[in-house]
């Protein structure tokens, strides 16, 4: 979607290299990323975008799931993490309305699997589900991608 927009792209990276496996995963994603994408690290929110001009650009957030996880681990409370997450996206959406940039959010659907056996796992699953619903309600288009095949929900 971002490539098809034909605009200069800002890639909002939300992953944190907490261990060697994650470092390798991030490195692989960096190598796969098109060279004309400008990467901005946004693991806890979008304040790093404040200094950037975003009009006539595409902004890709990859991914919402890591951002939610990072905020949950910082806040240690699902309700506080929810409020903080929707506040971050609310600011981003307000800016998008003013500047008109093309925004793509990538998230995971984790509510379709087995219920996690840990409290934190269940809290994350529920929190991400609420955030995904909040984002979908405010999005013009919503896709569900399975096996690389996009299904447009809205």
Q: What is each PLM-predicted segment?
A:
Residues 1-54:
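Conserved P-loop
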Residues 7-8, 55-57, 99-102:
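Short coil/turn segments at beta-strand junctions that form active-site/ligand-binding loops
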Residues 9, 59, 141-143:
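Short, well-ordered beta-strand core segments
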Residues 15, 43, 64-65, 109-110, ...:
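Short, flexible active-site-adjacent loop segments at beta-strand->alpha-helix junctions, enriched
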Residues 29, 60, 108:
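Conserved RecA-like P-loop NTPase ATPase core
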Residues 32-84:
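Helix-adjacent hinge/juxtasegments
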């Amino acid at each position: 979607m971002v490539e098809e927009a034909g605009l200069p792209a800002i890639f909002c990276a939300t992953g944190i290299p907490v261990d060697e496996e994650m470092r390798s995963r991030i490195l692989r994603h960096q190598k796969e990323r098109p060279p004309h994408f400008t990467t901005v690290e946004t693991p806890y929110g979008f304040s790093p975008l404040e200094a950037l001009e975003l009009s006539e650009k595409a902004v890709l957030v990859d991914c919402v799931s890591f951002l939610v996880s990072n905020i949950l681990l910082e806040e240690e409370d699902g309700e506080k993490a929810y409020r903080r997450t929707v506040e971050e996206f609310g600011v981003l959406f307000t800016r998008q309305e003013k500047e008109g940039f093309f925004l793509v959010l990538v998230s995971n659907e984790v509510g379709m699997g087995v219920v996690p056996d840990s409290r934190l796992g269940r809290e994350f699953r529920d929190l991400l589900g609420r955030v995904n619903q909040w984002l979908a309600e405010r999005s013009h288009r919503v896709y569900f991608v399975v096996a690389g095949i996009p299904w447009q929900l809205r």
